[in-house]
């Protein structure tokens, strides 16, 4: 069974990278807009490269120079969505390119997480823009208008900051500020979901269950699995 599962993983990696291998595209099509390159962990290139990098680390059949070359190429292509003058990642999902929120799913927070973890694997993939993305997080992680969800809210960002602080202690500086904001928010409004216009969602990543999980992680049990990685 293990051998069969290994083959499934290898074939899946080939399927994902096929457009680049055959020269049809310079990037891997993502969800939402299959004709566009997207940045991010949940919806973009960083998440795709991270998953494949973990597979390369574990499976000998995938430990090939050409695969590493493609993964490095994909990260460089994702860098095209970084505005170095205005210092933000671009959200390319809509009709117009706009500044991405500093969130896990499609913004700087998830990109920083993914790229730090990719480099930690030490398999020949170089994920850059770490310093710039960390700066964005330091300046903007607490500026959120979409509730407290894991996906793109305050709880998710706090969990990530706590995890990423092992890489950079400066990130601890904004955790206290965000916790005070969060506590004030809960006392005033109670649970809020991950939508701009609050809905009583019961989904894990967008709704109340994920908020409960995050609060337990932050206040009671930091040994809970880091569900966003």
What do these predicted regions represent?
Residues 7-28, 68-88, 125-145, 173-191:
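Long, well-ordered core segments of solenoidal/helical folds
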Residues 46-103, 108, 114:
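Acidic, glycine-rich loop-and-beta core segments that form the ion-binding/anion-interacting portion
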Residues 1, 37-54, 99-117, 148-163, ...:
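Well-ordered alpha-helical segments within folded domains of soluble proteins
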Residues 1-59:
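Solenoidal tandem-repeat scaffolds enriched in leucines and small polar residues
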Residues 1-4, 58-65, 121-125, 166-170:
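Short coil/turn connectors between adjacent alpha-helices in alpha-solenoid helical repeat scaffolds
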Residues 31-36, 92-99, 140-145, 195-198:
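Active-site-adjacent structural elements in folded domains
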Residues 138-152, 161-174:
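Intrinsically disordered, low-complexity segments enriched in Gly and acidic/Ser/Thr residues
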Residues 54, 58, 117-121, 125, ...:
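Terminal, non-catalytic domain-edge segments
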